[in-house]
C-alpha cells in the first residue's frame, strides 16, 4: 500500500466524489449501478481527479444507517471495476472496519473515516494491517451530540466514545479547541493500533454539525493542522453553509435552476482557491474542472516564491 509520500511535490490533489448511494444530498441515485459509477469515474479521471472517494452510505442530515453487507455490496464492485482499468488512487468513505477491509482488499488505497477511528473500535487495526493511508475527520456530531446542529444528523459509530462527563466538558470548548480534543483521541487510537503517522491526513469536518460561524472559524484554523505536522484533506463542496453565505449575499442558489446549481459549485471553488493558497494537500469536490482552475490560482499564491518573474510584455 501507499504512504503520504505521494502528496510530496504534487501540489494540491483533487479528490473526485463518487457516491454509489440512493440518498446522498447532491448526487444520490445517479451512480448506483456499476456501469454508471464506472462511467462517472472515467469522467472524473479524464477531467483531472487524482483520487476518487467512493462512498456507499450517505452522511447527510436525515440519512439512515446502511447495513455492513449492503455497503460492501455497493462499493466493492465499483472499486474492482475501476481498479481493472486504472491505477488512480481510490479512497473508500466509510467508518465501518469490515467495509474498509473489503474495500482495501478490492484495491482501495485510503480509508476516509468520518469518525476518525472512533466509530468502530476495529478500524484502526484494519488500516494498520493493510498499511493503508487514512483520513481522520473531526466529527462534531460525535463530539457534542446534543448540540442543535448535531441532532439533525444520524448517529455515527457503534457505541458512545466519550463519557457524559467528557461530553459536558467538551460542550463548553471553543470549536477550535474541540477539534483538537477530538483529534487527540483519534490520533491516540491510531498510534495504539500501529498506524504510521506518515499515513494519516486530518479533515477538519467542515459541514458536520457546525454553525456557519464555526465552519468559518475552522477554515481559519487550517494552519494549525499543518503546524502539528499533518496533511489536510478538506471537503467543502456544496456544503450548506457555503450556500447560505451566497444566498444572503443575494445570489440564486436553487439547485433546480441552472444558475443556482452553478453558483453553488462556483462558491465552493472559491474556497478551494483559498485552501490551496494555504497549502492544503487534498480537496474533495464534485466539479473537477471548476476546482482545478481554482486550485491552480491558489497554488500559484502558495508557491509565489517559485513563480517566474514574467513581466507585463511577456504575458500571452
Per-range role (PLM):
Residues 1-21, 191-195, 248, 303-316:
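N-terminal amphipathic alpha-helix/helix-capping segment at the start of soluble metabolic enzymes
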Residues 4-30, 62, 79-80, 137-171, ...:
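N-terminal small/glycine-rich loop or linker at the start of catalytic domains
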Residues 18, 44, 48, 93, ...:
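Conserved, mostly hydrophobic/aromatic
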Residues 20-22, 59-60, 118-209:
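Conserved anion-binding
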Residues 24-26, 50-77, 205-212:
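Glycine-rich, proline-tolerant flexible connector loops at the mouths of alpha/beta enzymes
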Residues 26-43, 70-73, 116-118, 176-183:
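Glycine-rich anion/phosphate-binding loops
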Residues 64-101, 129-139, 181, 219-234, ...:
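Alpha-helix-loop-beta-strand connector modules within alpha/beta enzyme cores
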Residues 127-128, 285-312:
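C-terminal helical cap(s) of enzyme catalytic domains, especially alpha/beta-barrels
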Amino acid at each position: 500500500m501507499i504512504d503520504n509520500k505521494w502528496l510530496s511535490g504534487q501540489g494540491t490533489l483533487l479528490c473526485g466524489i463518487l457516491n454509489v448511494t440512493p440518498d446522498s444530498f447532491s448526487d444520490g441515485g445517479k451512480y448506483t449501478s456499476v456501469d454508471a459509477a464506472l462511467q462517472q469515474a472515467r469522467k472524473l479521471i479524464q477531467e483531472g481527479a487524482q483520487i476518487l472517494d467512493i462512498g456507499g452510505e450517505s452522511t447527510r442530515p436525515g440519512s439512515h444507517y446502511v447495513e455492513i453487507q449492503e455497503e460492501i455490496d455497493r462499493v466493492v464492485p465499483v472499486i474492482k471495476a475501476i481498479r481493472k482499468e486504472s491505477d488512480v488512487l481510490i479512497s473508500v468513505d466509510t467508518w465501518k472496519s469490515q467495509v474498509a477491509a473489503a474495500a482495501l482488499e478490492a484495491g482501495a488505497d485510503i480509508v476516509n473515516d468520518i469518525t476518525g477511528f472512533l466509530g468502530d473500535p476495529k478500524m484502526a487495526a484494519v488500516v494498520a494491517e493493510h498499511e493503508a493511508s487514512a483520513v481522520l475527520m473531526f466529527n462534531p456530531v460525535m463530539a457534542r451530540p446534543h448540540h442543535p446542529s448535531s441532532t439533525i444528523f444520524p448517529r455515527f459509530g457503534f457505541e458512545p466514545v466519550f463519557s457524559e462527563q467528557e461530553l459536558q466538558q467538551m460542550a463548553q470548548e471553543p470549536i477550535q479547541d474541540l477539534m483538537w480534543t477530538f483529534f487527540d483521541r483519534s490520533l491516540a487510537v491510531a498510534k495504539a493500533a500501529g498506524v504510521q503517522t506518515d499515513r494519516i491526513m486530518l479533515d477538519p469536518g467542515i459541514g458536520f454539525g457546525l454553525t456557519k460561524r464555526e465552519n468559518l472559524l475552522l477554515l481559519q484554523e487550517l494552519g494549525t493542522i499543518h503546524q502539528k505536522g499533518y496533511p489536510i484533506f478538506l471537503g467543502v463542496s456544496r456544503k450548506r453553509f457555503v450556500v447560505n453565505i451566497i444566498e444572503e449575499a443575494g445570489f440564486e442558489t436553487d439547485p433546480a435552476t441552472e444558475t443556482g446549481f452553478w453558483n453553488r459549485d462556483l462558491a465552493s471553488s472559491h474556497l478551494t482557491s483559498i485552501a490551496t493558497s494555504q497549502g492544503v494537500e487534498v480537496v474533495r469536490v464534485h466539479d473537477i474542472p471548476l476546482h482545478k482552475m481554482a486550485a491552480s490560482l491558489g497554488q500559484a499564491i502558495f508557491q509565489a516564491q517559485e513563480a517566474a518573474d514574467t513581466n507585463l510584455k511577456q504575458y500571452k
